[in-house]
A protein has these predicted regions:
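Short, Lys/Arg-enriched, Gly/Pro-containing loop segments at transmembrane-helix junctions
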Residues: 197-203, 261-267, 430-438, 514-522
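Hydrophobic transmembrane architecture of multi-pass small-molecule transporters
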Residues: 2, 8, 39, 410-511, ...
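Transmembrane core module of solute transporters
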Residues: 14-73, 77, 96, 106-108, ...
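Helix-loop-helix hairpins in multi-pass membrane proteins, especially solute transporters
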Residues: 38, 69-213, 226
Length: 522
């Protein structure tokens, strides 16, 4: 194949159009990771699914996506970026339509898995394409644009899904993908070549490597998703999945190092800055997805907010991300990226620490500043991290580097949600015990609460025994609510310390210059 860059003959306007169409496809794929989060109850009722079954609507997507993200590099080399993205957009659109038409929970799980698998191909290819096509100031904007897309989409997902479900029907959270998906599929093939295919690679594909990748990452994602719900390794299914994942990992790494045609190359990790940027991206994914998950859960569980109210509250983080994107891009071209990401991590930690003062009365206005600080900080974190990871990568490794970098953020998110779910449960039980002990040690205070609640209940029932029972039940709910609130505060505080600890890595990163020519993909 030629070393020439096929995009060199394209005008800047055509390059921007290609990149814009692909970035929009990436936004759709990332939005659909979390879009069902605010609508699971409605989907469960609509498909007559059980509590354990409905969780697979999310798990199936994530398991399939995490397998495809690193695999996309090989496939884009084999059939070209243009046709991989087009095929992925087409199948993503069809699977979205079928999710909306799902007739039972089993069909929904199958179509969500296809949706996740095809969506996973669109995420890393956009990063590689952006860095391949542009140079100088335009390339410097790529991390900002894609950073905003990759953080804004999962942040807005629960809000968009909840809003659509409230005003229409849960099926429309999938139907809404159809028109833009058809447009992307129809337009992209005619915009121009990004690279040339190498179909001979398909004849030499190492299927054992592909299979072990699926078993390794799919099993790991299953353990992280299902572990918190089933007491981790005390559950036979989770323990079995963990062992299967370990076996898959052993085979995967053996094939990675010894296969004549590996589907994934780990050579980008030879660059220390790339490796450290991936670790930082893991932490960013941990904080981004965990905080995005925790805030709606708090508002729903403790405050009893509706999907619309939750969406209106968490939308603040998305707005500040949009504001921060051009600022982060500008700073990354003018200031050493290590300073930018250092400030970003400090502000992210500050935003999380502000959440640690949370009370059971917090709503939109109390959450406004912590969310704004966190939303602004995440772009200061991710924009220089993308630049550190992908600037200076050898042309032959750019696709693989992009896939690995994006994989680390998704893994960070999966680990984060699993960990914070476990922490919430453990801390809530601890605080419930402490609050109960405190009330036992202060019987006069507890008696006063019971008397007040009984007097209030007596206004609605003439039977003193019923009123007392209602008062005791209400007290139990109050203790549970306050224990949950204290647990959320503890989790946000621990997350803040994780970001502070990660600052140790930043000084050892060496950002590459952004003013070089576009890299060739071949």
């Amino acid at each position: 194949m030629s070393d020439a860059n096929p995009t060199a003959g394209l005008s800047d306007q055509r390059k921007l159009l290609i990149f814009g169409v692909m970035a929009f496809g990436q936004f759709m794929a990332l939005l659909d990771i979390q879009i069902v989060a605010g609508s699971l109850g409605s989907i469960q009722a609509g498909l007559s699914a059980g509590p354990d079954e409905i969780a697979w609507v999310q798990t199936a997507y994530l398991m399939a996506e995490i397998v495809m993200i690193p695999l996309a590099a090989f496939l884009s080399q084999a059939i070209s970026t243009r046709w991989l993205f087009t095929a992925s957009a087409a199948l993503f659109t069809i699977s979205s339509l079928m999710c909306g038409l799902a007739w039972d929970i089993d069909s929904m799980i199958v179509f969500r898995a296809i949706q996740g698998f095809t969506g996973g191909a669109m995420v890393p290819t956009v990063f590689a394409t952006g860095f391949a096509m542009f140079d100088g100031p335009k390339r410097a904007m790529i991390p900002a644009i894609l950073g905003m897309v990759s953080t804004l989409a999962p942040t807005l997902g629960p809000s968009v899904g909840g809003w659509v479900t409230d005003v229409a029907d849960w099926r429309w959270i999938f139907f809404m993908n159809v028109i833009p998906g058809v447009a992307i599929t129809a337009i992209l093939p005619f915009l121009g070549k990004v690279d040339e295919p190498n179909l001979s690679m398909l004849r030499k594909i190492d299927w054992l490597h592909v299979g072990s990748l699926a078993v390794f990452l799919g099993g790991l994602q299953y353990v992280l998703e299902e572990g918190p719900r089933h007491e981790w390794f005390t559950d036979t299914g989770v323990a079995s999945a963990a062992w299967i994942s370990v076996v898959g990992a052993v085979v995967f790494f053996e094939r990675t190092f010894f296969s004549t045609m590996p589907v994934i190359k780990l050579t980008p990790f030879k660059r220390p800055t790339f490796a450290m940027a991936c670790v930082l991206n893991l932490v960013i994914g941990f904080g981004l997805y965990s905080a995005t998950y925790l805030t709606p859960v708090f508002l729903g569980r403790v405050r009893g907010f509706t999907s619309m109210q939750i969406g209106g509250t968490v939308f603040v983080a998305g707005l500040t991300m949009a504001v921060a994107a051009p600022i982060a891009a500008r700073l990354s071209t003018k200031v050493d990226g290590r300073y930018v990401i250092g400030v970003g991590f400090c502000f992210f930690a500050l935003g999380l620490w502000m959440f640690s003062n949370i009370t059971s009365n917090w709503g939109f206005f109390e959450l406004l500043l912590p969310q704004a600080v966190r939303g602004f900080a995440v772009l200061l974190c991710i924009v220089p991290a993308v630049g550190m990871a992908l600037n200076g990568v050898a042309p032959s490794e750019l696709r693989y580097a992009s896939g690995l970098f994006n994989l680390m953020r998704n893994l960070g998110g999966a680990i984060g949600i699993a960990v914070v779910n476990t922490w919430i449960g453990d801390f809530a039980r601890t605080h419930t015990l402490r609050l109960s002990e405190s009330m036992s040690d202060n019987p006069e205070h507890a008696g006063g609460l019971i008397s007040g609640l009984t007097a209030y209940a007596s206004r609605f029932t003439p039977d003193p025994a019923i009123a007392l029972g209602q008062a005791q039940s209400q007290l139990v709910r109050i203790v549970g609510r306050e224990a949950a609130t204290l647990a959320f505060a503890d989790v946000f505080r621990l997350m803040a310390w994780i970001f502070i600890a990660a600052l140790v890595i930043v000084p050892f990163c060496k950002p590459a210059p952004t003013d070089g020519p576009p890299v060739s993909e071949h």
